[in-house]
């Protein structure tokens, strides 16, 4: 049901024509994988004050895929921040995370948020 709703959403709201919606969905899937990779890297690194960097990097990588990737990054980021707010996390931290998310999606360098000493692997 969810994939069907996504396709309808693409047609009606985003105005994706019939020849581009496959490309859009492919980009969205790739963007979702980029966001997941940034999340798993953040968990693996377990580095203090690195979450903004990984937020920006995941959104940047996803948005580089195209409109579908940028859409997936926005949906995932907004859902993640909404979930954090429901759990009682501070609004200031959420605003800072959203700033990093938008920074990455806009194509700006995510290394702006890179904490000192973070291994070059990331």
UniProtKB/Swiss-Prot annotation:
Query: Positions of the region Disordered?
Result: 100-122
Superkingdom: Eukaryota
**GO CC, any one term:** high-density lipoprotein particle
Instruction: Tell me, in one coarse class, where this protein mainly resides.
Output: secreted
Q: Which InterPro entries match?
A: Serum_amyloid_A (IPR000096), Synovial_Prolif_Regulator (IPR052464)
Using the record's annotations, give every residue carrying the modification Pyrrolidone carboxylic acid.
19
Name the Pfam families on file: SAA (PF00277)
Localization annotation: Secreted
GO BP annotations of the record are: acute-phase response
Q: What keywords are assigned to this protein?
A: Acute phase, Amyloid, HDL, Pyrrolidone carboxylic acid, Secreted, Signal
Q: Where is the signal peptide?
A: 1-18
Q: In which tissues is it expressed?
A: Expressed by the liver; secreted in plasma.
Sequence similarity: Belongs to the SAA family.
PANTHER family attached to this UniProt entry: SERUM AMYLOID A (PTHR23424), SERUM AMYLOID A PROTEIN (PTHR23424:SF29)
Functionally, this protein is described as follows: Major acute phase reactant.
Q: What is this protein called?
A: Serum amyloid A-2 protein
Its lineage opens with: Eukaryota, Metazoa, Chordata, Craniata, Vertebrata
């Amino acid at each position: 049901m969810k994939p069907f709703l996504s396709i309808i959403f693409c047609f009606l709201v985003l105005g994706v024509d019939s020849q581009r919606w496959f490309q859009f969905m492919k980009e969205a899937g790739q963007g979702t994988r980029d966001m997941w990779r940034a999340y798993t890297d953040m968990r693996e690194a377990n580095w203090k004050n690195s979450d903004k960097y990984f937020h920006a990097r995941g959104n940047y990588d996803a948005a580089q895929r195209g409109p579908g990737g940028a859409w997936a990054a926005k949906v995932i980021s907004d859902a993640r921040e909404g979930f954090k707010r429901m759990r009682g996390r501070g609004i200031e931290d959420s605003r800072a995370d959203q700033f990093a998310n938008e920074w990455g999606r806009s194509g700006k360098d995510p290394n702006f948020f890179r904490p000192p000493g973070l291994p070059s692997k990331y």
